[in-house]
């Protein structure tokens, strides 16, 4: 029997599909197993964050930022509080110790976020063991975050003018701390990460031939396309563009630290994976430098003479940082009252999700999982 024509099949992946990592719906047209068209459908997790911010005081907005990208809450807090501090200008001087604590916790948060991104992507491609290792190692970091902030994922720890409280006694540890103290001291975790976690991921997954076969030359994004689509973070650097806000436009005190920017070559799913893996090691380097400074420099963690009621002068500010998924930015408008007139949030995951119609056609339906995992979207951040 001769088949003269085939009929395309329209498939809905989600919004409850386990590989979409949230309530994301992908509408896919298939010719056999080959994808001819892909369209993301979002909005299932919209919670009116930007409108709610207009009805809250400036400090009351901080917990809402935690709930955008709930896997990297500390980075969201950092973006918002630094934006508001810009509105005040020289009236608020953040103590140096608070600045180091902010950077250290931001980089530890980057490690937790990347661990989950790598672990979940590996599991979606059939590798269960790395995902379990990911949860094992993140649990150690969450124990540290809980001791410092009282929360495991949602912290409400950073403050306009500093941080809520100083670090608990003994949490820093010593450079001699080993694996047995990985969940008790920050030095213990960093030494454990450098000695076990980082080499383990490289050997178990990155060097695995099956994993490479599933990710190399899959979802290739050129540098020109990445720039045209306003990509950032690991997605942009995976395409060979050496751009990291911590280096190129330093904020906080990142200009004081020594670290490198990992850059991919081919712009495929494997390169985006590799960049995140190497970024974890660079974050470890930054944390070590913070630990050395904090051990020798006690001091206040909140700006002196902070007003009881925060009323920044009229004005507007746009502030951006290097988040776990790319460039997180916050546009804040002040009318001189206790509440922001407007808060606009830039989500890198929202921007990167627009790549799906570009990257998916021409690949097999199984490759969509690798492409989506390499983009690393969090639906709380996409929908806000």
UniProtKB/Swiss-Prot annotation:
<dbReference type="GO" id="GO:0050136">
    <property type="term" value="F:NADH:ubiquinone reductase (non-electrogenic) activity"/>
</dbReference>
<dbReference type="Pfam" id="PF00346">
    <property type="entry name" value="Complex1_49kDa"/>
</dbReference>
<keyword id="KW-0874">Quinone</keyword>
<dbReference type="InterPro" id="IPR022885">
    <property type="entry name" value="NDH1_su_D/H"/>
</dbReference>
<comment type="similarity">
    <text>Belongs to the complex I 49 kDa subunit family.</text>
</comment>
<keyword id="KW-0813">Transport</keyword>
<comment type="subunit">
    <text>NDH-1 is composed of 14 different subunits. Subunits NuoB, C, D, E, F, and G constitute the peripheral sector of the complex.</text>
</comment>
<dbReference type="InterPro" id="IPR001135">
    <property type="entry name" value="NADH_Q_OxRdtase_suD"/>
</dbReference>
<keyword id="KW-0520">NAD</keyword>
<keyword id="KW-0472">Membrane</keyword>
<dbReference type="GO" id="GO:0051287">
    <property type="term" value="F:NAD binding"/>
</dbReference>
<dbReference type="GO" id="GO:0048038">
    <property type="term" value="F:quinone binding"/>
</dbReference>
<dbReference type="GO" id="GO:0005886">
    <property type="term" value="C:plasma membrane"/>
</dbReference>
<keyword id="KW-1003">Cell membrane</keyword>
<keyword id="KW-1278">Translocase</keyword>
<comment type="function">
    <text>NDH-1 shuttles electrons from NADH, via FMN and iron-sulfur (Fe-S) centers, to quinones in the respiratory chain. The immediate electron acceptor for the enzyme in this species is believed to be a menaquinone. Couples the redox reaction to proton translocation (for every two electrons transferred, four hydrogen ions are translocated across the cytoplasmic membrane), and thus conserves the redox energy in a proton gradient.</text>
</comment>
<protein>
    <recommendedName>
        <fullName>NADH-quinone oxidoreductase subunit D 2</fullName>
        <ecNumber>7.1.1.-</ecNumber>
    </recommendedName>
</protein>
<dbReference type="InterPro" id="IPR029014">
    <property type="entry name" value="NiFe-Hase_large"/>
</dbReference>
